[in-house]
A protein has these predicted regions:
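ATP/nucleotide-binding catalytic cores
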Residues: 74-79, 111-115, 193-195
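A short acidic (Asp/Glu
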Residues: 69-74, 100-102, 123-128, 183-190
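Conserved phosphate-binding loops in N-terminal lobes of ATP-dependent enzymes
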Residues: 2-75, 79, 143-160, 165-172
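Glycine-rich phosphate-binding loops at beta-strand->alpha-helix junctions
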Residues: 59-70, 163-194, 200, 204-205
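Acidic, glycine/GT-rich loop-and beta-edge segments that sit at the periphery of enzyme/chaperone cores
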Residues: 213-239
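Active-site neighborhood for divalent-cation/phosphate handling
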Residues: 57-104, 205
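Conserved phosphate-binding/catalytic loops in two-lobed NTP-binding clefts
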Residues: 83-96, 189-213
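Gly/Thr-rich phosphate-binding beta-strand-loop-beta motif of the actin/hexokinase/Hsp70
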Residues: 1-30, 102-142
Length: 239
Protein backbone atom coordinates (compact mmCIF):
# COMPACT_ATOMS: atom_id res chain seq x y z
CA UNK A 1 0.00 0.00 0.00
CA UNK A 2 3.01 2.28 0.40
CA UNK A 3 3.40 2.59 -3.40
CA UNK A 4 -0.12 3.43 -4.46
CA UNK A 5 0.49 7.07 -5.40
CA UNK A 6 0.90 10.46 -3.79
CA UNK A 7 -1.03 11.48 -0.69
CA UNK A 8 -1.98 15.14 -1.10
CA UNK A 9 -3.68 17.77 1.05
CA UNK A 10 -4.94 21.03 -0.46
CA UNK A 11 -6.32 24.18 1.17
CA UNK A 12 -8.79 25.82 -1.21
CA UNK A 13 -10.93 28.97 -1.32
CA UNK A 14 -11.97 29.62 -4.93
CA UNK A 15 -8.36 28.87 -5.85
CA UNK A 16 -5.61 26.84 -4.23
CA UNK A 17 -4.06 28.56 -1.20
CA UNK A 18 -1.43 25.95 -0.35
CA UNK A 19 -0.77 22.22 -0.65
CA UNK A 20 1.18 19.43 1.04
CA UNK A 21 2.37 15.95 0.10
CA UNK A 22 2.69 13.28 2.77
CA UNK A 23 6.30 12.14 3.16
CA UNK A 24 6.08 8.43 3.98
CA UNK A 25 9.66 8.26 5.25
CA UNK A 26 9.42 11.27 7.57
CA UNK A 27 5.79 10.59 8.48
CA UNK A 28 4.76 14.24 8.04
CA UNK A 29 3.22 16.53 5.40
CA UNK A 30 5.72 18.49 3.30
CA UNK A 31 4.78 21.82 1.69
CA UNK A 32 4.49 22.12 -2.09
CA UNK A 33 5.75 25.35 -3.67
CA UNK A 34 4.28 27.34 -6.56
CA UNK A 35 0.68 26.11 -6.38
CA UNK A 36 -0.97 29.18 -4.84
CA UNK A 37 -3.64 30.69 -7.09
CA UNK A 38 -4.02 27.62 -9.29
CA UNK A 39 -7.14 25.57 -9.83
CA UNK A 40 -7.26 22.26 -7.99
CA UNK A 41 -6.75 20.34 -11.23
CA UNK A 42 -3.74 22.45 -12.27
CA UNK A 43 -2.20 22.23 -8.79
CA UNK A 44 -2.48 18.44 -8.80
CA UNK A 45 -0.95 18.22 -12.27
CA UNK A 46 1.95 20.40 -11.14
CA UNK A 47 2.51 18.33 -7.99
CA UNK A 48 2.42 15.04 -9.90
CA UNK A 49 4.89 16.41 -12.44
CA UNK A 50 7.24 17.66 -9.77
CA UNK A 51 7.33 14.27 -8.07
CA UNK A 52 7.40 12.45 -11.43
CA UNK A 53 4.44 10.35 -10.33
CA UNK A 54 1.41 9.41 -12.41
CA UNK A 55 -1.13 8.52 -9.73
CA UNK A 56 -2.92 9.93 -6.72
CA UNK A 57 -3.18 7.55 -3.79
CA UNK A 58 -5.41 9.79 -1.70
CA UNK A 59 -6.48 13.44 -1.79
CA UNK A 60 -8.16 15.73 0.73
CA UNK A 61 -9.29 19.26 -0.11
CA UNK A 62 -10.01 21.58 2.80
CA UNK A 63 -12.62 24.11 1.75
CA UNK A 64 -14.15 27.05 3.58
CA UNK A 65 -16.97 27.03 1.04
CA UNK A 66 -20.45 25.79 1.89
CA UNK A 67 -22.34 26.59 -1.33
CA UNK A 68 -23.35 23.34 -3.00
CA UNK A 69 -22.48 24.61 -6.49
CA UNK A 70 -18.96 25.54 -5.41
CA UNK A 71 -18.50 22.19 -3.66
CA UNK A 72 -19.70 20.44 -6.81
CA UNK A 73 -17.13 22.46 -8.76
CA UNK A 74 -14.40 21.08 -6.48
CA UNK A 75 -15.64 17.54 -7.11
CA UNK A 76 -15.82 18.17 -10.86
CA UNK A 77 -12.20 19.38 -10.93
CA UNK A 78 -11.08 16.28 -9.07
CA UNK A 79 -13.18 13.92 -11.18
CA UNK A 80 -11.77 15.47 -14.37
CA UNK A 81 -8.40 13.96 -13.45
CA UNK A 82 -9.85 10.46 -13.23
CA UNK A 83 -9.62 10.30 -9.44
CA UNK A 84 -12.15 7.86 -8.02
CA UNK A 85 -14.65 8.92 -5.36
CA UNK A 86 -13.12 6.63 -2.75
CA UNK A 87 -9.74 8.31 -3.28
CA UNK A 88 -10.68 11.81 -2.15
CA UNK A 89 -12.35 13.79 0.63
CA UNK A 90 -13.63 17.36 0.93
CA UNK A 91 -13.46 18.68 4.47
CA UNK A 92 -14.27 21.85 6.38
CA UNK A 93 -11.78 23.81 8.50
CA UNK A 94 -12.53 22.20 11.87
CA UNK A 95 -12.66 18.73 10.37
CA UNK A 96 -9.21 19.30 8.85
CA UNK A 97 -7.88 20.66 12.13
CA UNK A 98 -9.18 17.58 13.96
CA UNK A 99 -7.13 15.34 11.68
CA UNK A 100 -4.08 17.50 12.36
CA UNK A 101 -4.52 17.68 16.13
CA UNK A 102 -5.22 13.99 16.67
CA UNK A 103 -2.29 12.94 14.49
CA UNK A 104 0.05 14.46 17.07
CA UNK A 105 1.34 12.88 20.29
CA UNK A 106 -1.42 11.92 22.72
CA UNK A 107 -0.07 14.26 25.40
CA UNK A 108 -1.07 17.17 23.15
CA UNK A 109 -4.78 16.27 23.08
CA UNK A 110 -5.58 13.99 26.05
CA UNK A 111 -7.22 16.84 28.03
CA UNK A 112 -8.75 18.49 24.98
CA UNK A 113 -7.24 20.60 22.22
CA UNK A 114 -8.16 24.17 21.28
CA UNK A 115 -8.05 26.01 17.95
CA UNK A 116 -8.13 29.81 17.85
CA UNK A 117 -8.78 31.29 14.41
CA UNK A 118 -8.53 35.09 14.48
CA UNK A 119 -9.01 37.43 11.51
CA UNK A 120 -8.15 40.62 13.40
CA UNK A 121 -11.72 41.34 14.45
CA UNK A 122 -13.51 38.06 15.16
CA UNK A 123 -11.92 35.17 17.01
CA UNK A 124 -13.47 31.73 16.66
CA UNK A 125 -12.46 29.21 19.29
CA UNK A 126 -13.08 25.48 18.95
CA UNK A 127 -12.35 22.95 21.66
CA UNK A 128 -12.13 19.32 20.56
CA UNK A 129 -12.30 16.44 23.01
CA UNK A 130 -12.92 12.72 23.24
CA UNK A 131 -16.25 11.41 24.48
CA UNK A 132 -17.39 7.81 24.86
CA UNK A 133 -20.96 6.54 24.63
CA UNK A 134 -22.10 2.92 24.45
CA UNK A 135 -18.53 1.77 23.89
CA UNK A 136 -18.02 4.08 20.90
CA UNK A 137 -15.42 6.86 20.92
CA UNK A 138 -16.35 10.26 19.53
CA UNK A 139 -14.45 13.47 18.93
CA UNK A 140 -16.80 16.37 19.64
CA UNK A 141 -16.39 20.13 19.33
CA UNK A 142 -17.57 23.16 21.30
CA UNK A 143 -17.50 26.59 19.67
CA UNK A 144 -17.27 30.15 20.97
CA UNK A 145 -17.02 33.39 19.01
CA UNK A 146 -15.94 36.80 20.23
CA UNK A 147 -15.83 40.12 18.38
CA UNK A 148 -13.00 42.50 19.21
CA UNK A 149 -13.42 46.21 18.43
CA UNK A 150 -10.36 46.91 16.33
CA UNK A 151 -11.17 50.65 16.24
CA UNK A 152 -10.89 51.19 19.98
CA UNK A 153 -7.10 50.92 20.16
CA UNK A 154 -7.56 48.29 22.86
CA UNK A 155 -7.85 45.22 20.64
CA UNK A 156 -4.73 43.48 21.97
CA UNK A 157 -5.81 44.04 25.58
CA UNK A 158 -9.32 42.75 24.86
CA UNK A 159 -7.89 39.70 23.10
CA UNK A 160 -5.66 38.81 26.05
CA UNK A 161 -8.55 39.30 28.49
CA UNK A 162 -10.88 37.10 26.48
CA UNK A 163 -8.34 34.29 26.00
CA UNK A 164 -7.53 34.41 29.72
CA UNK A 165 -11.21 34.15 30.58
CA UNK A 166 -11.68 31.30 28.11
CA UNK A 167 -8.96 29.18 29.68
CA UNK A 168 -10.29 29.89 33.16
CA UNK A 169 -13.37 27.95 32.00
CA UNK A 170 -11.85 25.32 29.71
CA UNK A 171 -9.02 22.83 29.98
CA UNK A 172 -6.75 21.87 27.10
CA UNK A 173 -3.50 20.01 26.61
CA UNK A 174 -2.57 22.31 23.75
CA UNK A 175 -3.76 25.35 21.83
CA UNK A 176 -3.16 26.19 18.18
CA UNK A 177 -3.37 29.71 16.76
CA UNK A 178 -4.03 30.55 13.13
CA UNK A 179 -5.51 33.35 11.04
CA UNK A 180 -4.27 36.70 9.74
CA UNK A 181 -5.08 38.40 13.06
CA UNK A 182 -2.14 36.64 14.70
CA UNK A 183 1.37 37.86 13.94
CA UNK A 184 3.48 34.70 13.92
CA UNK A 185 6.58 36.75 14.81
CA UNK A 186 5.14 38.75 17.72
CA UNK A 187 2.03 38.07 19.78
CA UNK A 188 0.37 40.79 21.89
CA UNK A 189 1.97 41.47 25.27
CA UNK A 190 0.72 39.00 27.86
CA UNK A 191 -0.88 36.59 25.40
CA UNK A 192 2.00 34.12 25.28
CA UNK A 193 2.01 33.86 29.07
CA UNK A 194 -1.71 33.06 29.10
CA UNK A 195 -1.42 30.50 26.31
CA UNK A 196 1.40 28.42 27.83
CA UNK A 197 0.00 28.42 31.37
CA UNK A 198 -0.50 24.67 31.80
CA UNK A 199 -0.56 23.74 28.11
CA UNK A 200 1.51 23.70 24.93
CA UNK A 201 0.93 26.48 22.41
CA UNK A 202 1.63 26.61 18.67
CA UNK A 203 1.04 29.20 15.95
CA UNK A 204 1.04 28.77 12.18
CA UNK A 205 -0.83 29.48 8.97
CA UNK A 206 -0.59 25.92 7.64
CA UNK A 207 -2.68 23.97 10.16
CA UNK A 208 -5.59 23.36 7.79
CA UNK A 209 -3.54 22.17 4.82
CA UNK A 210 -1.45 19.89 7.02
CA UNK A 211 -4.66 18.55 8.54
CA UNK A 212 -6.01 17.88 5.05
CA UNK A 213 -2.85 15.93 4.25
CA UNK A 214 -3.20 13.86 7.43
CA UNK A 215 -6.85 13.24 6.48
CA UNK A 216 -5.80 11.97 3.05
CA UNK A 217 -3.30 9.65 4.73
CA UNK A 218 -5.94 8.46 7.19
CA UNK A 219 -8.32 7.72 4.32
CA UNK A 220 -5.94 4.92 3.32
CA UNK A 221 -4.31 3.69 6.51
CA UNK A 222 -6.89 4.32 9.28
CA UNK A 223 -4.22 4.72 11.96
CA UNK A 224 -6.03 7.27 14.14
CA UNK A 225 -9.73 7.27 13.34
CA UNK A 226 -10.41 3.60 12.65
CA UNK A 227 -12.62 3.24 15.75
CA UNK A 228 -13.41 6.91 16.33
CA UNK A 229 -16.38 8.91 15.01
CA UNK A 230 -15.68 12.55 14.22
CA UNK A 231 -18.57 14.82 15.26
CA UNK A 232 -17.38 18.37 14.62
CA UNK A 233 -18.70 21.48 12.91
CA UNK A 234 -18.20 21.78 9.17
CA UNK A 235 -18.04 18.13 8.12
CA UNK A 236 -18.68 18.41 4.39
CA UNK A 237 -17.95 15.20 2.53
CA UNK A 238 -16.05 12.09 3.48
CA UNK A 239 -16.22 9.24 0.98
Amino acid sequence: MKDQGLIIGIEYDKSVIQACVYDMRAGIPVACDEVSGLSIADAIRRILGRYNVDEIGSLCVKSGLSDIEELNDISDQINSLGINENQYMITGPIQSFAYYAYSQQKELYKSGVVLMDYDGQIINIYRLSYNTADGVQYIVSAHEQYTIDSQSGMSDKKLVEYVSDYFSRNTASSVYLTGKGFDVKKLPDGLSKVLVNGRKAYIGQNLYVRGACYAAYENIYHDIFDNVTLLVDGCIKVN
